[in-house]
Amino acid sequence: MRKINPKKKEIVSELAQDITKSKAVAIVDIKGVRTRQMQDIRAKNRDKVKIKVVKKTLLFKALDSINDEKLTKLKDATTGQIAVLTSQLDPTEIYQMVQATLTKASPRGGEVAPADITVEPMVTGFPPGPMMTEFQKVGLQTGVEKGKIAIKKEAVLVKKGEVIPKDKAKIMAMLDIKPLEVGLELLGLYSDGVLYSADVLSLTPEKIAEQMAIGYAQALQISKASMFFVAEVLKDLIAEAKVKADAFAVAAQFITEENLKEFLAIANRNAIILNNELNKGNTTEKESEKVEEPKEAEKSVDESISEGLGSLFQ
């Protein structure tokens, strides 16, 4: 039978005791957290939380030894390199503390770019020499200004989603470019029989109020669309029904006391249109008569002259 390492057994026992005595226990991902940063996190929060970096297998043994079915669900949230936080703080306070550990950092190489990483035109603090070649190797256009290496043109070093190569990570560190956000990442938190996710704990009163307002508006829209009568939409539904009924009555030429004025207005408009059309026709006829009248006048004058001459010879 394989013997259990006494040191590991001690770690499991201490961890189980810490979890049992604490109001809350949280599992955090520590991937990317540098040693110095972890030391600073511990120093700043020494009076608030106890942070223990452990292997998953030891954590699982500690959870199993407590015999709390709900607590063991923390296993489902455990992945990657982890640390266990035990505290008497409320869940929201622990979440805020964890979020406060996030800091900007330059990559070391091998990380995934969270967004396009660009280098702006600048005058660096490096004198001309071998460093200029290093800049050019990663695709930067360089020159010399004021006795220093200058980046002449903006360039995208790494595109979003790409793995950051070590040579480009080195250049970012030299230029103090910090595209990464490094710190503790909350994976799961257990307190008073409830298992919390980071998404739940990230909700603020303002966010909750905003989401409630959005949900309320969507519920009203669904209620209207499905003709589900509730007090909140009843007035709107009645108003919409009246508008549709009025439009139907007009289309069917069904005259009521409410739409009489509208029918009169329609009749008036139609009368004006008809009158305009008739006036156009009369104007055309009069113009054609005016064109013919001179010919008739000329003809009557000739006839008068003929009649006058005829009377002289009678």
UniProtKB/Swiss-Prot annotation:
Ranges of compositional bias, category Basic and acidic residues: 283-302
Superkingdom, taxonomy of origin: Archaea
Coiled-coil segments: none
GO CC term, one of those recorded: cytosolic large ribosomal subunit
Keyword Kinase: no
Assigned keywords, A-Z: Ribonucleoprotein, Ribosomal protein, RNA-binding, rRNA-binding
Region (Disordered): 282-314
Gene Ontology molecular-function annotations: large ribosomal subunit rRNA binding; structural constituent of ribosome
GO annotation, biological process: cytoplasmic translation; ribosomal large subunit assembly
Oligomeric form and interacting partners: Part of the 50S ribosomal subunit. Forms part of the ribosomal stalk which helps the ribosome interact with GTP-bound translation factors. Forms a heptameric L10(L12)2(L12)2(L12)2 complex, where L10 forms an elongated spine to which the L12 dimers bind in a sequential fashion.
Family: Belongs to the universal ribosomal protein uL10 family.
Functional description taken from the UniProt entry: Forms part of the ribosomal stalk, playing a central role in the interaction of the ribosome with GTP-bound translation factors.
UniProt-listed PANTHER family: 60S ACIDIC RIBOSOMAL PROTEIN P0, LARGE RIBOSOMAL SUBUNIT PROTEIN UL10
Name recorded for this polypeptide: Large ribosomal subunit protein uL10
Protein's organism: Thermoplasma volcanium (strain ATCC 51530 / DSM 4299 / JCM 9571 / NBRC 15438 / GSS1)
Upper lineage: Archaea, Methanobacteriati, Thermoplasmatota, Thermoplasmata, Thermoplasmatales
